[in-house]
């Protein structure tokens, strides 16, 4: 028999699936509050969709092959190119600004390690058709609101923000004006916290920067507020408009109530080649994990992919690192949850009400909206001691048991946490079996008030 899942891939047993669902619920709930609508696209796309603009790093990590029709295809390693293609195809018909989100499964062939697998699920949130800094602020506010929804605060997570246009202007003033050395600077800044200073110096020198330029470049990541730049840089005519734009952006974040989560960090450049403006990443404040989330403005990508000249911005937030952070902060559910609302057991009335009556009643209860479990054995229902069936119900995680307590009554008894202290309740069995709407509503109301409201006590 084959072993477990492939390296870097995951099986989702019920407990793990519940944890994934916990994250997905937060993603969808916050997206709903911000008026984003959900979409999806194919997991398999033409290879050149990813090799065109994503850069060499992703191109080398693709799961790609030639299909039976001779087409070069790849499993999606990211969602933004698919999103851009879809929007470009209907650019004239879509109401602007577009506010879409998706939760695709993505695939990259890379070394599996902590926080990075060969597959993961990722929330993608994108806005198309708006150039204002308010759209950039709205986007980051979505990401931070998700952190809050999951129980995290600004002491747990920091948002590090930069602007590629500002950085390009600063580099030009420093003297780094050509595309090739600028790309080398981006690569150094992206890794500056993870490599020794002398390595950064050597790489910048190799790119043709002078010692004076190198020193000026290496000062940039130390700037933590907009007043921290050298005066000759901050006052340069080419730089000032970009500083003003970032200041406006930060002001919007203040108004949205999330400014205290945000740090200026010019080492945040994002690895993908298509970002053009404000970019950001979210990290755990202790610095123990990889980036939780990253994104920014990519105003040229839609035009490059489909000829739709529309400004756009977005972010991706994966489930792997976020899940690790929630576990580290004890904010992740440990089990698959509460099980069924009700577990049907044989009681004192099992002889008067054989399994057929039990099946009719549980069917009616399911139609009324309850989740109902039972032992799937007529023999156990009739003959197994009630205490053994109740023990099975408790192990299943059911909130309460339900049984025929006599020939004329149904008994509901809570099982979970303080529900064990809640009073049991008896209902007349005949109206329930007759599908009497009033009787079923009475049971449902009692359950909602007595069981559901106490479940999380």
Describe every region a protein language model picked out.
Residues 144-148, 165-173:
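Hydrophobic mid-domain F-helix/FG-region of cytochrome P450s
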Residues 1-81, 89, 137, 141, ...:
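TRNA-binding/sensing appendages of the translation machinery
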Residues 154-165, 263-267:
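Short, surface-exposed recognition loops or helix-turn segments adjacent to catalytic cores
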Residues 55, 196, 234-237:
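Glycine-centered helix-coil hinge/cap
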Residues 172-183, 187, 192-195, 352-370:
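Acidic, Ser/Thr-rich low-complexity intrinsically disordered segments
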Residues 19-35, 45-46, 69, 80-92, ...:
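Positively charged, Gly/Ser-enriched RNA/tRNA-binding surfaces
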Residues 75, 95, 113, 117-119, ...:
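Short, well-structured alpha-helical patches and their helix-loop capping segments
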Residues 60-69, 175-204, 284:
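Acidic, His- and aromatic-enriched active-site or binding-groove loops in soluble protein domains
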């Amino acid at each position: 028999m084959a072993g477990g899942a492939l390296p870097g891939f995951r099986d989702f047993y019920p407990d793990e699936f519940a944890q994934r669902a916990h994250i997905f619920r937060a993603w969808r709930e916050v997206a709903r509050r911000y008026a984003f609508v959900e979409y999806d696209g194919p997991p398999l796309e033409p290879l050149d969709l990813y090799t065109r603009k994503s850069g060499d790093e992703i191109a080398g990590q693709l799961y790609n092959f030639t299909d039976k029709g001779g087409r070069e295809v790849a499993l999606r390693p990211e969602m933004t190119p698919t999103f851009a293609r879809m929007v470009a195809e209907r650019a004239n018909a879509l109401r602007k600004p577009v506010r879409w989100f998706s939760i695709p499964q993505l695939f990259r062939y890379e070394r599996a390690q902590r926080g990075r697998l060969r597959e993961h699920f990722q929330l993608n949130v994108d806005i198309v058709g708006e150039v204002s800094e308010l759209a950039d602020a709205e986007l980051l506010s979505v990401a931070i609101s998700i952190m809050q929804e999951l129980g995290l605060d600004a002491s747990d997570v920091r948002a590090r923000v930069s602007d590629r246009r500002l950085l390009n202007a600063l580099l030009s003033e420093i003297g780094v004006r050509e595309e090739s050395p600028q790309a080398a600077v981006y690569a150094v800044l992206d890794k500056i916290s993870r490599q020794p200073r002398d390595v950064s110096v050597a790489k910048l020198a190799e790119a043709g920067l002078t010692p004076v330029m190198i020193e000026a470049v290496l000062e940039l990541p130390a700037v933590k507020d907009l007043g921290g730049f050298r005066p000759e840089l901050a006052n340069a005519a080419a730089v000032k408009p970009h500083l003003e734009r970032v200041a406006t952006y930060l002001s919007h974040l203040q108004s949205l109530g999330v400014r205290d989560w945000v740090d200026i960090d010019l080492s945040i450049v994002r690895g993908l080649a298509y970002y053009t403006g404000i970019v950001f990443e979210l990290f755990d404040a202790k610095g123990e994990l990889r980036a939780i989330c990253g994104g920014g403005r990519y105003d040229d990508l839609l035009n490059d992919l489909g000829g739709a000249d529309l400004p756009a911005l977005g972010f991706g937030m994966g489930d792997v690192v976020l899940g690790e952070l929630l576990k580290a902060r004890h904010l992740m559910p440990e089990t698959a949850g509460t099980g069924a609302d009700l577990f049907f057991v044989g009681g004192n009335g099992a002889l008067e009400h054989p399994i057929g009556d039990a099946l009719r009643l549980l069917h009616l209860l399911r139609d009324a909206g309850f989740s109902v479990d039972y032992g799937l054995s007529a023999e156990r229902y009739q003959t197994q001691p009630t205490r053994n069936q109740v023990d099975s119900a408790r192990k299943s995680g059911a909130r309460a048991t339900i049984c025929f307590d006599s020939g004329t009554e149904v008994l509901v008894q809570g099982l979970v946490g303080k529900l064990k202290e809640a009073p049991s309740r008896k209902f007349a069995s005949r109206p329930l079996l007759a599908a009497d709407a009033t009787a079923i509503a009475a049971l449902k109301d009692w359950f909602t008030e007595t069981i559901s409201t106490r479940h999380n006590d």
